[in-house]
Amino acid sequence: MESYLEENFGGVKAKNSSEEALRRWRKLCGVVKNPKRRFRFTANLDKRGEAQAIKHANHEKLRVAVLVSKAALQFIQGLSLRSEYVVPEEVKAAGFQICADELGSIVEGHDSKKLITHGGVTGIADKLATSPADGLSTAEESIKRRQDVYGLNKFTESEVRSFWVFVWEALQDTTLIILAVCAFVSLVVGIAMEGWPKGAHDGLGIVASILLVVFVTATSDYRQSLQFKDLDKEKKKIQVQVTRNGFRQRLSIYDLLPGDVVHLAIGDQVPADGLFISGFSLLINESSLTGESEPVVVNEDNPFLLSGTKVQDGSCKMLITTVGMRTQWGKLMATLSEGGDDETPLQVKLNGVATIIGKIGLFFAVITFIVLSQGLISKKYHEGLLLSWSGDDALEMLEHFAIAVTIVVVAVPEGLPLAVTLSLAFAMKKMMNDKALVRHLAACETMGSATTICSDKTGTLTTNHMTVVKACICGNIKEVNNPKNASDLCSELPETVVKTLLESIFNNTGGEVVIDQDGKYQILGTPTETALLEFALSLGGNFKAKRDETKIVKMEPFNSTKKRMCVVLKLPGGGCRAHCKGASEIVLAACDKFMDETGAVVPLDKTTADKLNGIIESFANEALRTLCLGYREMEEGFSVEEQIPLQGYTCIGIVGIKDPVRPGVRESVATCRSAGIMVRMVTGDNINTAKAIARECGILTEDGLAIEGPEFREKSLDELLKLIPKIQVMARSSPLDKHTLVKHLRTTFNEVVAVTGDGTNDAPALHEADIGLAMGIAGTEVAKESADVIILDDNFSTIVTVAKWGRSVYVNIQKFVQFQLTVNVVALLVNFSSACFTGNAPLTAVQLLWVNMIMDTLGALALATEPPNDDLMKREPVGRTGKFITNVMWRNILGQSFYQFIVMWYLQTQGKSMFGLDGPDAEVVLNTIIFNSFVFCQVFNEISSREMEKINVLRGILKNYVFLGVLTSTVVFQFIMVQFLGEFANTIPLTRLQWIASVLLGLIGMPISAIIKLLPVGSS
């Protein structure tokens, strides 16, 4: 079966499946009782096609708009323009001078002509009653007016479907519709023959069973849909930096309004349409909106920023002009919200299993109907009444047909793929509480098979709370882990050195020091920037004063490829100065001079360079991150178009930044090792820092290898194949190195790879990995969008929790499959064999519907929601080539099925003598005992299925309230059904002895199951 499934249903991958593969597997699902329900959570490929068409149209629209705008600009250069725009009265009344439609046409149409007629960006800001420096006012009445005129930054989403929609969908099950028709005919014929109410019992019994199945199914599906809706809302929560009332603050993108001033950096998503106010080296990736991969330069000449696009490089301040559904992104999102998620590989395989068993069930159902009908016809023939049919005969034939249809209901295990959805929804909800947000269903499933985790160091293995603890300035090494030490260092250094150092830190930064509403200093920026700015403040520096002294001419922000950040300043006395900071070895290699202890600039000879490199190494050996700062004097005529020089710098000093290892990381790494998961550290830091941290975390072992990115890049393919299995630490790595490592691990070594990432440049590796894990705090929006799971607390221990939940989902579904296939096999065999050999079926349509509900919805609820236990992390991972339906499962299924079938067959043939049954009700009593015993066999088999290999199946059962609730409700309802609903369920109240016997026959299944588990099975 496994090879058939792989061949026919294995084309769908956990990530990046082709559309052809997604369409193909659905066509292969031959027997589907309710397509609407079965395929509810699968991707809507038609909607995706619509989204692609919108992207293509956007691309064409933007291309035309830019061409028209350029042509118009050629005509209006130098002309004095007067706006002919008329402000609508309601906009004027609200205190604004421009309407939403006009703003939309300017930005979306890239209309430079209109922008100039409105006075450029500052003119638009005035008309929006806002300030490019201080942002808009937060007065409640002002915000309300703005919302009324321009709308909210929210997109139209598909409405939450009501409970009754799910009821209607559950009713569209083909087999239930056929049974409903049978019930209707049964009611009509029964009432005509026996009158009301006696003649209605059989028909009403089927109707009641159908309604019960429908309502339980609809309730389960409705709860799942609400869970997915909640998770979808979590995915869309994005915070941005905004200036309002002159103060910087973080705000949800849903609270943004036209007139807001937003600050963007590398990796951010543009939250709404708007205009560029100021910034440096801004490159925008518009592929999410237009499909065009070439980045666009945005500056004063091309100031248009479109919602949904991403900052690829640089930083800027933007003015929001258009929000929500008025933007192209809003329209695209409304379409994509109906696109759905791809079906996971496990769901697809289980659809295959359901199809195979469904076809077998259909075959047996037809044979059963033929055999039962043949028995009736044969009886009529022998009685000479073949042409004389009564209402009773019609009802009997109808009952045979209903039994055949119900065999299909039981035999087609549609609960299998739906159990995956139920289990994943349950796990995703619980993982949210454990600080992990699953973006793609398949990731939760794939994480259970992970064999390797490639983890970042900073913020994942470490706390990301950084402080400068050591500094080497002018050759003077000093501990600066408290304000007094920093003050002492400042007094020991020449004034010119302190001035240059503060100028470097305060200007060459992506961070900012602001005063909050309480009048206190607040440092904004990455943890590294924050540590440096805190250090500069402790030296007595004033951020605003230093920034006001000079003017920034050009800035090149830090990224993980260049590993440095540079800025060119225009000095107050004339001339320019470039400042550079970054990875110590790289910046020091760019220096040919240094500042000595007197503050004099002297040539950097080999001896001094070696000494400084030794200091870098000693800092790194103490697990400190090191940064080197340098500057270079330049000519006054430096132009923005010129490249900032890469050489000729003067070394100011080196700082050592402490980033402590997170508590619990060492234990989590040990847990991974015992679970057969190899943890590798991939970092941009110095190799000595990386090795020190890796040893502290327990990642780097005696036989492990630590390698630098540049060395890794130079290796030949043959050398890489020998090295990669041993690599535990990769330092000074570029995003491309990470991508190469992941690709080789996946393709050459067949590993299932999880990768963490936080930066924009990590997106390719996150995309390539089987499971991409983005950091929720330090991660950029680009990284989060490329990821499958977002680690909300940036903690490595959470990644281990995700792996544990992934394994739990996988094992829970295996348990459910084992349980359901057992019920399938036994129900099929009992009714088929009985029909063939005795001419009647002991399990009626109503009873089989009840069994189907125990098996499908309640069984899935009980077994697929079992929480994870620590034992899951003591077994080897399934890996890429592991079989889903294992030999252990086949052993348990066949063993338990054999026991149950023997019990049912014995009751069928010897039950009357065993219980001393005679008289007119003997047949009904026996069939009730068979039904009751069959249900209790499933109840105890459900308990046995909690463990596939272990004997102790009761461990932790009292903590699983869902499981206990399902078992209790099953037993209670079974009692009511047998004792009180006999007219509807074709049962008769049983004696105490008969109840004890039924329960005991089910209970014996547990020790039988334990004995079966002792039987050894091979791996093939």
From Swiss-Prot:
Its main location: membrane. Mg(2+) binds at D758, D762. SMART domains: Cation_ATPase_N. Keywords: ATP-binding, Calcium, Calcium transport, Calmodulin-binding, Ion transport, Magnesium, Membrane, Metal-binding, Nucleotide-binding, Phosphoprotein, Translocase, Transmembrane, Transmembrane helix, Transport. GO terms for cellular component: intracellular membrane-bounded organelle; plasma membrane. One of its GO terms (molecular function) is ATP hydrolysis activity. Residues 1-175, 220-263, 373-400, 864-887, 945-961, 1016-1020 are cytoplasmic. Its EC number is 7.2.2.10. It catalyses: Ca(2+)(in) + ATP + H2O = Ca(2+)(out) + ADP + phosphate + H(+). The chain crosses the membrane at residues 176-196, 199-219, 264-284, 352-372, 401-421, 843-863, 888-907, 924-944, 962-982, 995-1015. It comes from the Eukaryota. Activated by calmodulin. InterPro entries: ATPase_P-typ_cation-transptr_C, ATPase_P-typ_cation-transptr_N, ATPase_P-typ_cyto_dom_N, ATPase_P-typ_P_site, ATPase_P-typ_TM_dom_sf, ATPase_P-typ_transduc_dom_A_sf, Ca_ATPase_N_dom, HAD-like_sf. The keyword Ion transport applies. The active site is at D456 (4-aspartylphosphate intermediate). It is a multi-pass membrane protein. Residues 21-32 are annotated as: Interaction with calmodulin. Gene3D superfamilies: 1.20.5.170, Calcium-transporting ATPase, cytoplasmic domain N, Calcium-transporting ATPase, cytoplasmic transduction domain A, Calcium-transporting ATPase, transmembrane domain, HAD superfamily/HAD-like. The keyword Membrane applies. Belongs to the cation transport ATPase (P-type) (TC 3.A.3) family. Type IIB subfamily. The N-terminus contains an autoinhibitory calmodulin-binding domain, which binds calmodulin in a calcium-dependent fashion. PANTHER family: CALCIUM-TRANSPORTING ATPASE 10, PLASMA MEMBRANE-TYPE, CATION TRANSPORTING ATPASE. This magnesium-dependent enzyme catalyzes the hydrolysis of ATP coupled with the translocation of calcium from the cytosol out of the cell, into the endoplasmic reticulum, or into organelles. This is Calcium-transporting ATPase 10, plasma membrane-type. The gene is ACA10.
